[in-house]
């Protein structure tokens, strides 16, 4: 046994051992030593994008998963911990543009490197189940299910709005539009309507909302999904009109439809606003050049709802009027840049008096503001918006004719009934959630399995011809989709008529790839999308990932699961029973700012920090030139702030176990973790202490085999088993930081137990190693082997979890605080089962009491059981 802890050697030996015995390969219906089938547990981290290297967020996420998997395996569970790669997506195309390499080559190189990094972390991954979403054997099932959805009407085609770069002749993702311009060309971006494919996620809106209640997810995530789904009860109604198009027919059958949750304010409508693409806007623009120019300006704006909420609200009158459905008054129609054609009917009613956005719009364009809701004791003014203007809980209708005096619900009911009687409206539930547009005008993604034929139209690719394979040797140049320029891919034969045809060149949203990968892990070699093995493992018991995926990924995966269920592919409603969202990893930031305001960020490793007398940062200088840098505070590790820590460098210097120990000890899994170089050093020191104890006591521990602890070990055993009880509780709560604290207490107890027998040391260190093992498996494995535990039991991989010996927790003696005349003077040791009389006698006879009594007998002795004795003289 080495006298010094050498992480590299210890970790290499452990990993070679695990590889040799295929330690992490898992099978369904595994049985335990007793011959009984083990209960399954599926614990999975969200699969990473193969960006090139692991970052500390990855290390934290996967270590949490690994600790859980190893702990549960030792507790007799059949645990699945797989891994794969979310391999399609725009970063690979960007890398191809920058480096002139095919996205496929870049992606596969990154996968190989990151897999090697994961293996160096000692993760208990069953690599036989590895999945890469860019593999044709994987994405063929994306295509297969898409075609099934198309058959059932869940997938459909309609026009959608995209960002178009007129110079590069390509569609841009929202994040590629910077201040209204293309990120590469700098050209002003246009909005364009193009045919796209959508999935009817809105058909599942109520189920997606209702099923959240039964999930073991953080409340914060549930609320985020609830808000995104956004159930609204309101009234959809029409403003009639006589506006005719060039064909002489009424536009939209003479009705401008809107939806509102505030039908009680309908009598306060002073304008309507429509989207730039609305038929009324198009009609008005034909004879109004200024309006046509404004509409064109609107088309250059963002197509993101979030941007709509924050941008400046602009409008222009169309000159058109519609009729108020209840009063018969004429209402002006405006075009508003804040109205989206893709939301509802592409039109909204304007009630400036009781809607903050409409209020600001009306003030800007000098539109009428008509108060129709009053709250007792409040005075209305158009000088500034006040919160009570939008109050529906306390407001009553005024200036509303027959509805005056009605509260919110009564007014909505009455107004909805009157609109229905006129055939102009009805109560309706609407959703903020929109159908999922899955078409992407990009190369590196799942090809949409459709063929365009001049004779037959759009024709699905026959199932026997799946997968439609993506060519992997194309290098994007930034000018359009390379699939549209590759005749090998583009040109095909129509499966219906046999004539020459063209493949669809759009690819699928990469969120589709992550909708079901965790199911493919269960049966990666299946000849169908999933098989019976998926029924065994799913639903997943524990999902682990970042809060940034709280909405889209998790929502889409839930939807995809429900579609698979309805097609008879799975037997469960929800994919993820429990969810843990780990906190971000934070680090210090440092920068310099030039005269133009541009910041240059310095990595913390390249900075010297000066501290004051209290140890707080007082200043910082760059190591390169000794000149000051600004301390920017603690922020999430990121490339943009250059404050990341390279996990590989950390592992190379300290070993994987030190990295794992630090990220588990520094904070509870769900909370933010602040990076600390001194904390890493502390973790390394602790592991050296563990090794040193094993080395120093190696002979005693070996000699203790086959013998029982003695009475001299009672105090040590009591401490070990007391701490074990707490550690077990913390493991079950996924509070791994306090588990590490428990192991530190155990080591302290072992080091302090100078008189412990070989058996006592052997048992105590055995407990410590097993409690430590899920967190730092390499050193625990090495010491387990070196000290002979494996010969006596089994490999620590499958060693039984230590059981708390309740008898060891019972104390034969207890220590009481000893007071004389109410002041603490010392302590008193008495038998644990001593009665009051025995305690009083022991106290009266103690040397401490004798010293203060000076021969006088105690007047009274007060005993507080289990705590103290007070001798009154």
Curated annotation (Swiss-Prot):
It catalyses: tRNA(Leu) + L-leucine + ATP = L-leucyl-tRNA(Leu) + AMP + diphosphate. It is found in: Cytoplasm. InterPro entries: aa-tRNA-synth_I_CS, aa-tRNA-synth_Ia, Leu-tRNA-ligase, Leu_tRNA-synth_edit, M/V/L/I-tRNA-synth_anticd-bd, Rossmann-like_a/b/a_fold, tRNAsynth_Ia_anticodon-bd, Val/Leu/Ile-tRNA-synth_edit. Coiled coil: none annotated. GO terms for biological process: leucyl-tRNA aminoacylation. ATP binds at residue 639. Its EC number is 6.1.1.4. It comes from the Bacteria. Belongs to the class-I aminoacyl-tRNA synthetase family. This is Leucine--tRNA ligase. It comes from Cupriavidus metallidurans (strain ATCC 43123 / DSM 2839 / NBRC 102507 / CH34) (Ralstonia metallidurans). The lineage of its organism: Bacteria, Pseudomonadati, Pseudomonadota, Betaproteobacteria, Burkholderiales. The gene is leuS.
């Amino acid at each position: 046994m080495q006298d010094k802890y050498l992480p590299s050697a210890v970790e290499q030996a452990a990993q070679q051992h695990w590889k040799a015995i295929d330690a992490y390969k898992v099978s369904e219906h595994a049985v335990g030593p007793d011959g009984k089938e083990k209960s399954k547990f599926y614990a999975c981290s969200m699969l990473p994008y193969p960006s090139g290297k692991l970052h500390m967020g990855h290390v934290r996420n996967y270590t949490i998963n690994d600790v859980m998997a190893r702990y549960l395996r030792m507790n007799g569970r059949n645990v699945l911990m797989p891994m794969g790669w979310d391999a399609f997506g725009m970063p690979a195309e960007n890398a191809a543009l920058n480096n002139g390499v095919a996205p496929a080559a870049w992606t596969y190189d990154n996968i190989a490197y990151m897999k090697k990094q994961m293996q160096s972390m000692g993760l208990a991954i069953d690599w036989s189940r590895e999945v890469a979403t860019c593999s044709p054997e994987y994405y063929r099932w994306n295509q297969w299910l898409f075609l099934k959805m198309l058959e059932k009407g869940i997938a459909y085609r309609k026009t959608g709005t995209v960002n178009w770069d007129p110079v590069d002749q390509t569609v841009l993702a929202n994040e590629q539009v910077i201040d209204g311009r293309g990120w590469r060309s700098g050209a002003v971006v246009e909005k364009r309507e193009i045919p796209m494919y959508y999935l009817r996620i809105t058909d599942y809106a109520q189920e997606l909302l209702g099923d959240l209640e039964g999930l073991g997810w953080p409340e914060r995530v549930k609320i985020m999904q609830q808000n995104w789904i956004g159930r609204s009860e309101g009234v959809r109604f029409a403003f009639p009109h006589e506006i005719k198009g060039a064909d002489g027919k009424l536009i939209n059958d003479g009705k401008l439809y809107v939806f509102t949750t505030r039908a009680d304010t309908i009598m306060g409508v002073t304008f309507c606003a429509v989207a730039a693409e609305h038929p009324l806007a198009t009609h008005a623009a034909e004879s109004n050049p200024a309006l046509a120019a404004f509409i064109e300006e609107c088309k250059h704006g963002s197509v993101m709802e979030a941007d709509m909420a924050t941008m400046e609200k602009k409008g222009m009158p169309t000159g058109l009027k519609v009729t108020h459905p209840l009063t018969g008054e004429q209402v002006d129609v405006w075009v508003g840049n804040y109205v989206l054609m893709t939301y509802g009917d592409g039109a909204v009613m304007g009630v400036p008096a009781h809607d903050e956005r409409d209020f600001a719009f009306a003030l800007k364009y000098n539109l009428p503001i008509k108060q129709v809701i009053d709250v007792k004791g409040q005075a209305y003014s158009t000088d500034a918006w006040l919160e009570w203007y939008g109050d529906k809980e306390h407001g009553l209708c005024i200036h509303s004719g027959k509805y005056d005096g009605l509260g919110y619900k009564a007014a909505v009911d009455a107004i909805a009934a009157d609109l229905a009687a006129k055939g102009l409206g009805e109560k309706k539930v609407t959703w903020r959630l929109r159908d999922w547009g899955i078409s992407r005008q990009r190369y590196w993604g799942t090809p949409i399995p459709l063929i365009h034929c001049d004779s037959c139209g759009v024709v699905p690719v026959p199932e026997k011809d799946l997968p439609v394979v993506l060519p992997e040797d194309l290098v994007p140049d930034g000018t359009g989709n390379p699939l549209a320029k590759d005749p090998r891919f583009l040109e095909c034969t129509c499966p219906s008529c046999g004539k020459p045809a063209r493949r669809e060149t759009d690819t699928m949203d990469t969120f589709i790839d992550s909708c079901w990968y965790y199911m493919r892990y269960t049966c990666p070699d299946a000849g169908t999308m999933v098989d019976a093995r998926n029924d065994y493992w799913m639903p997943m018991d524990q999902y682990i990932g970042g809060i940034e995926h709280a909405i889209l990924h998790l929502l889409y995966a839930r939807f995809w699961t429900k579609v698979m269920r309805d097609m008879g592919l799975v037997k469960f409603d929800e994919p993820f029973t429990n969810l843990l969202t780990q906190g971000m990893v934070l680090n210090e930031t440092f920068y310099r700012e030039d005269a133009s305001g541009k910041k240059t960020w310095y990595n913390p490793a390249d900075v010297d920090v000066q501290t004051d007398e209290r140890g707080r940062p007082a200043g910082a200088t760059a190591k390169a030139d000794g000149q000051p840098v600004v301390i920017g505070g603690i922020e999430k590790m990121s490339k943009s702030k250059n404050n990341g820590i390279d996990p590989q460098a950390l592992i190379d210097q300290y070993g994987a176990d030190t990295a794992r120990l630090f990220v588990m000890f520094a904070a509870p899994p769900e909370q933010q973790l602040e990076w600390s170089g001194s904390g890493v050093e502390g973790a390394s020191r602790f592991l050296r202490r563990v090794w040193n104890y094993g080395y120093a006591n190696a002979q005693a521990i070996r000699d203790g085999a086959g013998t029982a602890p003695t009475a001299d070990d009672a105090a040590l055993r009591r401490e070990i088993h007391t701490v074990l009880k707490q550690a077990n509780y913390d493991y079950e709560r996924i509070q791994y930081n306090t588990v590490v604290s428990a192991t530190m207490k155990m080591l302290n107890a072992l080091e302090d137990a100078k008189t412990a027998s070989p058996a006592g040391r052997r048992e105590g260190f055995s407990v410590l190693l097993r409690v430590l093992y899920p967190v730092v498996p390499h050193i625990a494995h090495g010491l387990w082997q070196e000290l002979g535990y494996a010969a006596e039991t089994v490999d620590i991989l499958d060693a039984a979890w230590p059981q708390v010996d309740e008898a060891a927790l019972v104390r034969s003696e207890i220590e009481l605080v000893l007071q004389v005349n109410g002041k603490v003077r010392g302590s008193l040791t008495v038998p644990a089962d001593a009665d009051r009389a025995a305690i009083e006698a022991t106290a009266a006879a103690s040397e401490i009491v004798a010293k203060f009594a000076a021969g006088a007998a105690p007047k009274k002795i007060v005993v507080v059981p289990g705590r103290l004795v007070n001798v009154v003289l």
